[in-house]
């Protein structure tokens, strides 16, 4: 499964992307502290939804047909080939929007305890 915060810095400004992730994690930790939570884990449903979105975005690119480093190519015993992205390709603004939606939604998609 693709990670909830996949590293997309291979296709954007590393500093900007790193700052976005650091801000988001910091905000989540502050939210957890205010709510007296000490544990956060993405739900299986959220992981599947995010993975599907990452793969769907990637499938719409020409990169999906390559055998480059950003693609995990698996050759199945039945002769089929499966290509999965190793990075997020949806773009910085969309990534920020998705992160903000999760935060503003009270970290919906995460189990907090």
What would you call each of these model-derived segments?
Residues 2-113:
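C-terminal, flexible cofactor-proximal segment of oxidoreductases
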């Amino acid at each position: 499964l693709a990670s909830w915060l996949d590293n997309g810095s291979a296709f954007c400004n590393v500093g900007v992307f790193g700052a976005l992730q650091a801000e988001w994690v910091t905000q989540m930790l502050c939210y957890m502290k205010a709510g007296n939570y000490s544990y956060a884990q993405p739900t299986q449903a959220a992981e599947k939804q995010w993975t599907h979105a990452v793969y769907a975005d990637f499938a719409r690119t020409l990169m999906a047909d390559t055998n480059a480093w950003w693609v995990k190519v698996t050759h199945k015993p039945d002769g089929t080939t499966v290509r999965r992205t190793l990075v997020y390709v949806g773009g910085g603004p969309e990534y920020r929007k998705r992160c903000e939606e999760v935060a503003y939604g009270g970290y919906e998609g995460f189990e907090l305890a």
